[in-house]
From Swiss-Prot:
InterPro entries cross-referenced by the UniProt entry: PCRF (IPR005139), Pep_chain_release_fac_I (IPR000352), Pep_chain_release_fac_I_sf (IPR045853), Prokaryotic/Mito_RF (IPR050057), RF-1 (IPR004373)
Origin superkingdom: Bacteria
Organism: Bordetella pertussis (strain Tohama I / ATCC BAA-589 / NCTC 13251)
In-chain residues carrying the UniProt-annotated modification N5-methylglutamine: Q235
A GO MF label: translation release factor activity, codon specific
Pfam families to which the protein is assigned, alphabetical: PCRF, RF-1
Cross-referenced SUPFAM superfamilies: Release factor
GO CC list: cytoplasm
Gene: prfA
Localisation per UniProt entry: Cytoplasm
Function statement: Peptide chain release factor 1 directs the termination of translation in response to the peptide chain termination codons UAG and UAA.
The entry's keywords: Cytoplasm, Methylation, Protein biosynthesis
Protein name per the record: Peptide chain release factor 1
First-listed, main subcellular location of the protein, grouped into a coarse class: cytoplasm
Length: 360
Protein backbone atom coordinates (compact mmCIF):
# COMPACT_ATOMS: atom_id res chain seq x y z
CA UNK A 1 0.00 0.00 0.00
CA UNK A 2 1.22 3.48 -0.88
CA UNK A 3 2.32 5.47 2.20
CA UNK A 4 -0.02 8.33 1.17
CA UNK A 5 -3.00 5.96 1.06
CA UNK A 6 -2.10 4.42 4.43
CA UNK A 7 -1.73 7.91 5.92
CA UNK A 8 -5.17 8.90 4.60
CA UNK A 9 -6.77 5.78 6.11
CA UNK A 10 -5.05 6.39 9.46
CA UNK A 11 -6.44 9.95 9.45
CA UNK A 12 -9.95 8.61 8.86
CA UNK A 13 -9.57 6.05 11.68
CA UNK A 14 -8.48 8.85 14.03
CA UNK A 15 -11.40 11.02 12.88
CA UNK A 16 -13.88 8.21 13.68
CA UNK A 17 -12.59 8.17 17.28
CA UNK A 18 -13.05 11.96 17.43
CA UNK A 19 -16.60 11.76 16.04
CA UNK A 20 -17.58 9.03 18.53
CA UNK A 21 -16.31 11.24 21.36
CA UNK A 22 -18.24 14.25 20.05
CA UNK A 23 -21.44 12.21 19.70
CA UNK A 24 -21.13 11.15 23.35
CA UNK A 25 -21.12 14.78 24.55
CA UNK A 26 -24.39 16.13 26.06
CA UNK A 27 -23.99 19.36 24.06
CA UNK A 28 -24.18 17.38 20.81
CA UNK A 29 -27.37 15.59 21.84
CA UNK A 30 -28.94 18.98 22.55
CA UNK A 31 -28.11 20.31 19.07
CA UNK A 32 -30.03 18.17 16.55
CA UNK A 33 -28.43 19.72 13.46
CA UNK A 34 -24.94 19.00 14.81
CA UNK A 35 -26.02 15.52 15.93
CA UNK A 36 -27.38 14.67 12.46
CA UNK A 37 -24.27 16.03 10.73
CA UNK A 38 -21.92 14.00 12.95
CA UNK A 39 -24.11 10.89 12.61
CA UNK A 40 -23.94 11.14 8.80
CA UNK A 41 -20.16 11.57 8.99
CA UNK A 42 -19.88 8.52 11.25
CA UNK A 43 -21.99 6.44 8.85
CA UNK A 44 -19.59 7.34 6.03
CA UNK A 45 -16.43 6.73 8.08
CA UNK A 46 -17.38 3.43 9.73
CA UNK A 47 -17.26 1.08 6.67
CA UNK A 48 -13.91 2.55 5.57
CA UNK A 49 -12.33 2.21 9.01
CA UNK A 50 -13.73 -1.32 9.50
CA UNK A 51 -12.24 -2.39 6.16
CA UNK A 52 -8.91 -0.78 7.08
CA UNK A 53 -8.82 -2.56 10.45
CA UNK A 54 -9.50 -5.89 8.70
CA UNK A 55 -6.67 -5.09 6.27
CA UNK A 56 -4.30 -4.37 9.19
CA UNK A 57 -5.30 -7.70 10.78
CA UNK A 58 -4.39 -9.68 7.65
CA UNK A 59 -1.17 -7.67 7.30
CA UNK A 60 -0.24 -8.59 10.90
CA UNK A 61 -0.99 -12.27 10.21
CA UNK A 62 1.36 -12.23 7.21
CA UNK A 63 4.09 -10.60 9.32
CA UNK A 64 3.68 -13.32 11.98
CA UNK A 65 3.86 -16.05 9.32
CA UNK A 66 7.08 -14.53 7.94
CA UNK A 67 8.66 -14.82 11.39
CA UNK A 68 7.80 -18.55 11.37
CA UNK A 69 9.77 -19.21 8.14
CA UNK A 70 12.95 -19.80 10.12
CA UNK A 71 11.33 -22.76 11.93
CA UNK A 72 11.73 -25.89 9.70
CA UNK A 73 8.65 -27.52 11.25
CA UNK A 74 6.48 -24.49 10.53
CA UNK A 75 7.94 -23.35 7.21
CA UNK A 76 5.47 -25.10 4.86
CA UNK A 77 2.45 -23.86 6.79
CA UNK A 78 3.91 -20.35 7.03
CA UNK A 79 4.49 -20.21 3.26
CA UNK A 80 0.85 -21.17 2.64
CA UNK A 81 -0.36 -18.50 5.07
CA UNK A 82 1.86 -15.86 3.44
CA UNK A 83 0.61 -16.74 -0.05
CA UNK A 84 -3.05 -16.66 1.03
CA UNK A 85 -2.55 -13.50 3.09
CA UNK A 86 -0.86 -11.57 0.28
CA UNK A 87 -3.71 -12.44 -2.10
CA UNK A 88 -6.22 -11.18 0.47
CA UNK A 89 -4.19 -8.00 1.04
CA UNK A 90 -4.30 -7.26 -2.69
CA UNK A 91 -8.09 -7.74 -2.79
CA UNK A 92 -8.63 -5.66 0.35
CA UNK A 93 -6.44 -2.83 -0.91
CA UNK A 94 -8.52 -2.65 -4.12
CA UNK A 95 -11.71 -2.55 -2.03
CA UNK A 96 -10.25 0.22 0.15
CA UNK A 97 -9.42 2.26 -2.94
CA UNK A 98 -13.08 2.10 -3.97
CA UNK A 99 -14.15 3.16 -0.47
CA UNK A 100 -11.82 6.17 -0.68
CA UNK A 101 -13.36 7.45 -3.92
CA UNK A 102 -14.98 10.87 -3.52
CA UNK A 103 -18.74 10.56 -3.19
CA UNK A 104 -21.13 12.75 -5.12
CA UNK A 105 -23.25 14.39 -2.39
CA UNK A 106 -26.23 14.34 -4.77
CA UNK A 107 -26.16 10.56 -5.42
CA UNK A 108 -28.77 9.78 -2.78
CA UNK A 109 -31.27 12.35 -4.04
CA UNK A 110 -34.45 12.13 -6.06
CA UNK A 111 -34.29 13.61 -9.56
CA UNK A 112 -36.05 15.47 -12.34
CA UNK A 113 -36.05 13.75 -15.73
CA UNK A 114 -36.53 16.00 -18.75
CA UNK A 115 -37.02 14.46 -22.21
CA UNK A 116 -37.26 16.65 -25.32
CA UNK A 117 -38.02 15.58 -28.88
CA UNK A 118 -35.30 16.66 -31.28
CA UNK A 119 -34.64 15.87 -34.92
CA UNK A 120 -37.21 13.60 -36.50
CA UNK A 121 -40.54 15.38 -35.92
CA UNK A 122 -43.43 13.09 -34.93
CA UNK A 123 -41.17 10.03 -34.75
CA UNK A 124 -38.90 11.84 -32.28
CA UNK A 125 -41.93 12.73 -30.13
CA UNK A 126 -43.05 9.09 -30.17
CA UNK A 127 -39.59 8.00 -29.06
CA UNK A 128 -39.74 10.55 -26.21
CA UNK A 129 -42.79 8.63 -24.99
CA UNK A 130 -40.91 5.34 -25.34
CA UNK A 131 -38.00 6.69 -23.29
CA UNK A 132 -40.32 7.98 -20.55
CA UNK A 133 -41.95 4.53 -20.40
CA UNK A 134 -38.49 2.89 -20.22
CA UNK A 135 -37.39 5.05 -17.29
CA UNK A 136 -40.78 4.65 -15.57
CA UNK A 137 -40.55 0.85 -15.79
CA UNK A 138 -36.99 0.98 -14.43
CA UNK A 139 -38.12 3.19 -11.54
CA UNK A 140 -40.93 0.75 -10.73
CA UNK A 141 -38.48 -2.17 -10.47
CA UNK A 142 -36.51 -0.11 -7.95
CA UNK A 143 -39.55 0.90 -5.92
CA UNK A 144 -39.25 4.58 -6.90
CA UNK A 145 -42.24 6.84 -7.47
CA UNK A 146 -42.72 8.71 -10.77
CA UNK A 147 -44.75 11.93 -11.03
CA UNK A 148 -45.31 13.90 -14.24
CA UNK A 149 -44.50 17.56 -13.53
CA UNK A 150 -45.10 19.02 -17.00
CA UNK A 151 -45.91 17.62 -20.43
CA UNK A 152 -46.40 18.89 -23.96
CA UNK A 153 -47.99 16.09 -25.96
CA UNK A 154 -47.60 15.49 -29.68
CA UNK A 155 -50.71 15.13 -31.87
CA UNK A 156 -49.70 11.60 -32.95
CA UNK A 157 -48.71 10.52 -29.43
CA UNK A 158 -45.57 10.85 -27.39
CA UNK A 159 -44.20 14.16 -26.19
CA UNK A 160 -42.60 17.27 -27.59
CA UNK A 161 -41.32 17.73 -24.02
CA UNK A 162 -42.02 15.99 -20.73
CA UNK A 163 -40.64 16.54 -17.23
CA UNK A 164 -41.05 13.87 -14.55
CA UNK A 165 -39.92 13.66 -10.94
CA UNK A 166 -38.47 10.31 -9.89
CA UNK A 167 -38.60 10.03 -6.12
CA UNK A 168 -36.46 7.37 -4.49
CA UNK A 169 -33.32 6.81 -2.47
CA UNK A 170 -30.28 6.80 -4.77
CA UNK A 171 -32.29 7.58 -7.93
CA UNK A 172 -29.94 10.32 -9.12
CA UNK A 173 -26.80 8.29 -8.43
CA UNK A 174 -28.12 5.47 -10.61
CA UNK A 175 -29.44 7.52 -13.54
CA UNK A 176 -27.16 10.57 -13.65
CA UNK A 177 -25.25 9.33 -16.70
CA UNK A 178 -28.41 9.16 -18.85
CA UNK A 179 -28.11 12.84 -19.80
CA UNK A 180 -27.34 13.44 -23.46
CA UNK A 181 -28.68 12.79 -26.96
CA UNK A 182 -30.43 9.43 -27.50
CA UNK A 183 -30.71 8.38 -31.15
CA UNK A 184 -33.24 5.88 -32.51
CA UNK A 185 -33.11 4.02 -35.83
CA UNK A 186 -36.36 2.28 -36.84
CA UNK A 187 -39.21 2.17 -39.36
CA UNK A 188 -41.83 4.71 -38.17
CA UNK A 189 -45.46 3.59 -37.94
CA UNK A 190 -46.31 6.30 -40.51
CA UNK A 191 -43.70 5.06 -43.04
CA UNK A 192 -45.44 3.27 -45.93
CA UNK A 193 -42.25 2.31 -47.81
CA UNK A 194 -40.66 0.49 -44.86
CA UNK A 195 -37.63 2.79 -44.80
CA UNK A 196 -35.56 3.14 -41.64
CA UNK A 197 -35.58 6.66 -40.21
CA UNK A 198 -33.16 8.18 -37.71
CA UNK A 199 -34.39 10.60 -35.06
CA UNK A 200 -33.18 11.78 -31.68
CA UNK A 201 -34.28 12.99 -28.25
CA UNK A 202 -32.39 14.86 -25.57
CA UNK A 203 -32.49 13.59 -22.00
CA UNK A 204 -31.55 15.68 -18.97
CA UNK A 205 -31.26 14.14 -15.49
CA UNK A 206 -31.11 16.73 -12.70
CA UNK A 207 -30.82 16.12 -8.93
CA UNK A 208 -33.63 17.58 -6.88
CA UNK A 209 -32.47 20.77 -5.18
CA UNK A 210 -32.73 21.13 -1.42
CA UNK A 211 -35.03 24.13 -1.04
CA UNK A 212 -33.37 25.08 2.23
CA UNK A 213 -29.73 25.24 1.20
CA UNK A 214 -28.87 24.31 -2.39
CA UNK A 215 -30.16 27.18 -4.47
CA UNK A 216 -31.10 30.70 -3.43
CA UNK A 217 -33.61 32.23 -5.85
CA UNK A 218 -34.20 35.97 -5.55
CA UNK A 219 -37.92 36.69 -6.16
CA UNK A 220 -36.96 39.89 -7.98
CA UNK A 221 -35.15 37.73 -10.58
CA UNK A 222 -38.40 36.00 -11.55
CA UNK A 223 -41.07 36.90 -14.09
CA UNK A 224 -44.25 34.90 -13.49
CA UNK A 225 -46.95 34.68 -16.16
CA UNK A 226 -50.26 32.81 -16.01
CA UNK A 227 -52.27 31.49 -18.95
CA UNK A 228 -54.92 28.94 -19.85
CA UNK A 229 -53.74 25.34 -20.08
CA UNK A 230 -53.84 23.72 -23.52
CA UNK A 231 -53.78 20.14 -24.77
CA UNK A 232 -52.30 18.40 -27.81
CA UNK A 233 -52.89 20.48 -30.94
CA UNK A 234 -53.11 23.68 -28.93
CA UNK A 235 -56.79 23.62 -27.94
CA UNK A 236 -57.57 25.20 -24.57
CA UNK A 237 -58.70 22.67 -21.98
CA UNK A 238 -59.22 24.98 -19.01
CA UNK A 239 -61.30 28.13 -18.68
CA UNK A 240 -59.14 29.61 -15.92
CA UNK A 241 -55.54 30.86 -16.02
CA UNK A 242 -54.21 27.89 -14.05
CA UNK A 243 -51.04 27.33 -16.13
CA UNK A 244 -47.86 29.03 -14.93
CA UNK A 245 -44.73 30.13 -16.77
CA UNK A 246 -41.73 31.23 -14.68
CA UNK A 247 -38.76 32.97 -16.28
CA UNK A 248 -35.49 33.32 -14.38
CA UNK A 249 -34.33 36.61 -15.90
CA UNK A 250 -30.56 36.40 -15.13
CA UNK A 251 -30.15 33.01 -16.86
CA UNK A 252 -33.08 33.06 -19.29
CA UNK A 253 -34.31 29.69 -17.98
CA UNK A 254 -38.06 29.20 -18.54
CA UNK A 255 -40.29 26.60 -16.86
CA UNK A 256 -43.95 25.98 -17.65
CA UNK A 257 -46.37 23.83 -15.66
CA UNK A 258 -50.03 23.35 -16.61
CA UNK A 259 -50.87 19.78 -15.60
CA UNK A 260 -52.69 20.67 -12.39
CA UNK A 261 -56.02 22.51 -12.18
CA UNK A 262 -54.59 24.57 -9.32
CA UNK A 263 -52.46 27.58 -10.27
CA UNK A 264 -50.81 27.42 -6.85
CA UNK A 265 -49.73 23.79 -7.30
CA UNK A 266 -48.51 24.49 -10.84
CA UNK A 267 -46.41 27.36 -9.48
CA UNK A 268 -44.95 25.10 -6.76
CA UNK A 269 -44.05 22.45 -9.36
CA UNK A 270 -42.50 25.05 -11.67
CA UNK A 271 -40.38 26.43 -8.81
CA UNK A 272 -39.14 22.92 -7.98
CA UNK A 273 -38.12 22.32 -11.59
CA UNK A 274 -36.51 25.79 -11.84
CA UNK A 275 -34.44 25.15 -8.68
CA UNK A 276 -33.30 21.80 -10.11
CA UNK A 277 -32.38 23.43 -13.45
CA UNK A 278 -30.36 26.17 -11.74
CA UNK A 279 -28.54 23.58 -9.62
CA UNK A 280 -28.00 21.47 -12.75
CA UNK A 281 -26.59 24.48 -14.64
CA UNK A 282 -24.02 25.11 -11.90
CA UNK A 283 -23.14 21.43 -11.75
CA UNK A 284 -22.71 21.05 -15.53
CA UNK A 285 -20.40 24.07 -15.66
CA UNK A 286 -18.29 22.47 -12.91
CA UNK A 287 -18.36 19.04 -14.60
CA UNK A 288 -17.36 20.54 -17.93
CA UNK A 289 -14.32 22.15 -16.33
CA UNK A 290 -13.37 18.94 -14.46
CA UNK A 291 -13.90 16.81 -17.59
CA UNK A 292 -11.57 19.07 -19.55
CA UNK A 293 -8.94 18.72 -16.84
CA UNK A 294 -9.35 14.94 -16.49
CA UNK A 295 -10.27 14.24 -20.15
CA UNK A 296 -13.31 12.41 -18.80
CA UNK A 297 -15.77 10.73 -21.16
CA UNK A 298 -18.40 10.01 -18.52
CA UNK A 299 -20.29 12.82 -16.82
CA UNK A 300 -18.89 15.66 -18.93
CA UNK A 301 -22.17 17.57 -18.62
CA UNK A 302 -22.44 18.01 -22.41
CA UNK A 303 -26.12 17.55 -23.33
CA UNK A 304 -25.47 17.76 -27.07
CA UNK A 305 -23.20 14.69 -26.98
CA UNK A 306 -24.73 11.63 -28.68
CA UNK A 307 -24.47 9.05 -25.96
CA UNK A 308 -26.60 6.12 -27.14
CA UNK A 309 -28.18 4.57 -30.23
CA UNK A 310 -31.25 2.31 -30.21
CA UNK A 311 -31.31 0.29 -33.46
CA UNK A 312 -34.64 -1.53 -33.75
CA UNK A 313 -33.98 -3.62 -36.91
CA UNK A 314 -30.88 -5.13 -35.27
CA UNK A 315 -32.34 -5.26 -31.73
CA UNK A 316 -29.21 -3.39 -30.65
CA UNK A 317 -28.42 -0.70 -28.08
CA UNK A 318 -24.97 0.92 -28.20
CA UNK A 319 -23.58 3.31 -25.60
CA UNK A 320 -20.95 5.29 -27.48
CA UNK A 321 -19.12 6.61 -24.40
CA UNK A 322 -17.94 3.18 -23.28
CA UNK A 323 -18.29 1.29 -26.59
CA UNK A 324 -20.82 -1.09 -25.05
CA UNK A 325 -23.25 -2.88 -27.40
CA UNK A 326 -26.09 -5.04 -26.08
CA UNK A 327 -28.43 -7.09 -28.27
CA UNK A 328 -31.38 -6.84 -25.87
CA UNK A 329 -33.23 -3.76 -27.08
CA UNK A 330 -36.69 -5.06 -26.17
CA UNK A 331 -35.69 -5.81 -22.57
CA UNK A 332 -33.98 -2.42 -22.24
CA UNK A 333 -37.05 -0.55 -23.53
CA UNK A 334 -39.06 -2.48 -20.91
CA UNK A 335 -36.86 -0.97 -18.20
CA UNK A 336 -34.03 -3.52 -17.90
CA UNK A 337 -31.33 -0.85 -17.51
CA UNK A 338 -29.11 -2.33 -14.80
CA UNK A 339 -26.46 -3.67 -17.19
CA UNK A 340 -26.16 -0.28 -18.92
CA UNK A 341 -26.21 1.87 -15.79
CA UNK A 342 -23.87 -0.55 -13.98
CA UNK A 343 -21.32 -0.42 -16.81
CA UNK A 344 -21.40 3.39 -16.82
CA UNK A 345 -20.92 3.54 -13.04
CA UNK A 346 -18.01 1.07 -13.28
CA UNK A 347 -16.34 3.22 -15.95
CA UNK A 348 -16.84 6.32 -13.82
CA UNK A 349 -15.26 4.55 -10.85
CA UNK A 350 -12.32 3.50 -13.04
CA UNK A 351 -11.79 7.14 -14.00
CA UNK A 352 -12.00 8.16 -10.34
CA UNK A 353 -9.49 5.44 -9.37
CA UNK A 354 -7.07 6.68 -12.02
CA UNK A 355 -7.41 10.20 -10.63
CA UNK A 356 -7.07 8.92 -7.04
CA UNK A 357 -3.89 7.04 -7.95
CA UNK A 358 -2.53 10.25 -9.39
CA UNK A 359 -3.48 12.27 -6.32
CA UNK A 360 -2.27 9.82 -3.64
Amino acid sequence: MKPSMRSRLEQLAHRLIEVDALLAEPETAADMDRFRKLSRERAELEPVVEAFNAFLGVEADVATAQEMLSDPDMKAMAEDEIKTGRARIEEMEAALQLLLLPRDPDDGRSLFLEIRAGTGGDESALFSGDLLRMYTRYAETRGWRVEIMSESESELGGYKEVIARIDGDGAYGRLKFESGAHRVQRVPATEAQGRIHTSACTVAVMPEADAMSDIVINPSDLRIDTFRASGAGGQHINKTDSAVRITHVPTGLVVECQDDRSQHRNKDKAMQVLAARLKDKEMRERQSKEAAERKSLIGSGDRSERIRTYNYPQGRVTDHRINLTLYKLQQIMEGDLDELTGALLAEHQAEQLAALGHDL
